Amino acid sequence: MHTLDSLDAESRRTDVPEFWPGDTLKVHVRVVEGNRQRIQVFQGVVIRRQGGGVRETFTVRKVSFGVGVERTFPLHSPIVSRVEVVTRGDVRRAKLYYLRQLRGKAAKIKEKREPVGR
C-alpha cells in the first residue's frame, strides 16, 4: 500500500492553484492535431470537483453560442498545461448541477469579495 501512495505523490502536480466550485477558470489544454500540438483555452465555471489524489477531476461549464458545453479534466493530467483562476464565486453547494437549467442572468454566480489585507 505504501508503494501506491509514493507513486501517487510523485505524479501529483504542484503548480495547480486552489479553486472550488463556483470559481471561473481558464484551463489551458494541449490539443494534438496530427503531428502538431497547440494550446487551447477553455474558460468557464467549475461545477464540480470529484475524487482525490491523482484521480481527482473537475468539470468546467461554459455557454458557447447559446449551447452549454461541459468538459471534465483530470487535475493532474499532462493534457492540462495550466489552470488560472479568473474570479472567485460565492456559492453554497459543492455540486452546481442546477446551473444546467438556468439561462441568462439567472445563471450568473455572485462574486466572492475578499478583505483588502489578504
Swiss-Prot record:
Q: Name one GO cellular component term.
A: cytosolic large ribosomal subunit
Q: Which cysteines are joined by disulfide bonds?
A: none
PROSITE patterns for this protein: RIBOSOMAL_L19
Has keyword Ribosomal protein?
yes
Leader sequence residues: none
What's a BP term from Gene Ontology annotated to this protein?
translation
Q: Which domain of life is it from?
A: Bacteria
Q: Pfam families under this entry?
A: Ribosomal_L19 (PF01245)
Q: Which keywords accompany this UniProt record?
A: Ribonucleoprotein, Ribosomal protein
Which molecular-function annotations from GO does this UniProt entry contain? structural constituent of ribosome
Ribosomal protein is among the record's keywords: yes
Instruction: Report the sequence similarity comment from the record.
Output: Belongs to the bacterial ribosomal protein bL19 family.
What is this protein's function? This protein is located at the 30S-50S ribosomal subunit interface and may play a role in the structure and function of the aminoacyl-tRNA binding site.
Q: What name is this protein filed under?
A: Large ribosomal subunit protein bL19
Species: Parafrankia sp. (strain EAN1pec)
Taxonomic lineage:
Bacteria, Bacillati, Actinomycetota, Actinomycetes, Frankiales
